[in-house]
Amino acid sequence: YGIMRKVIGLANYHLNQVKTYEAEIYMKGTALFDRLPRAIAKRIEVNDIRVKEDKAYMLESLNEVTYQAPDNYDMKILASQNTIPGYSEAVNPMDYVNASLYQEEIEGFVSPLARSAFFYYNFSFEGSYIQGTHMIDKIRVTPKRKSQQLCEGYIYIVEDLWCLHSSDLEINTIAGTLYLEQLYANVIMDAWLPVSHKIDMNVEIAGVRANITYVSSLEYEEVELNPNLPRSYFASTSQGQGAEPEKKEPSEEQQRIQEILEKEELNNRDMAKLNKLMEKEVEASEDEEESLQ
């Protein structure tokens, strides 16, 4: 629980640590229908072409994305193809790339990193391993009750940075079981950013049985961190890319954050205080950015 209190307390920080980035995003979606009632197949028929059982359908695209915090995206489709009958719209890869566990909710289910996570989940430490210069902690996530708004599985945490390394979660929905896998990488100066996503869903509803999969991968070309959120909270464990932002004298709130993080064990009160302080830090960084514009 000590690990998770630090991760949850710093979720707002990691959610807002990037100011801008440019990236190339590849996305591929596939669908295979094991069982498809004729009435439903008829409804999605286009020009006498209908979706068939035991045939794989695919859509994929290569995209160039420019991101500007907090939520501005400029996307250019470089290439795309689609074999799904009647489906002409391009899928926006940002719908999947933006699915961050640092948010309170993702598509209606409560994130295990939400401020209220301890009300919904039990966490257990199941060991650790070394990757490069980092210690990675394996945390089991178990919902306290059965609900379509809760997930279960594993999250992996980068120790001392208290950020996500990866996740392997499943959610039981009314339409079937959804599996969510994410992988993060140390892209710049110990800032771990998402580099791959996989959503796999076994659908069983209204007589339909199918498997639907989306995978996406990101290759970052340029990344600029939020200069108003200091990296001094963490001891640097690798050189990374890019230059260290100019250091500023820590504010009173930043000193309080540092004091909490230096504690060996955090209690729930410390976690709530850390989360609140970090929320103020993010708001202050946004105000400072607006004043410079």
Task: Name the predicted role of every residue range.
Residues 153, 159, 179-190, 220:
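Extended lipid/amphipathic-ligand handling interfaces
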Residues 167, 195-197:
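Beta-strand-dense domains in secreted/periplasmic systems and polymorphic toxin scaffolds
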Residues 17, 36, 171-178, 183:
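Outer-membrane beta-barrel proteins
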Residues 33, 147-150, 172-177, 209:
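Solvent-exposed loop/turn segments connecting transmembrane beta-strands
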Residues 135-136, 142-154, 158, 163-170:
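A conserved hydrophobic secondary-structure block that centers on an alpha-helix together
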Residues 198-216:
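Outer-membrane beta-barrel translocator/channel fold
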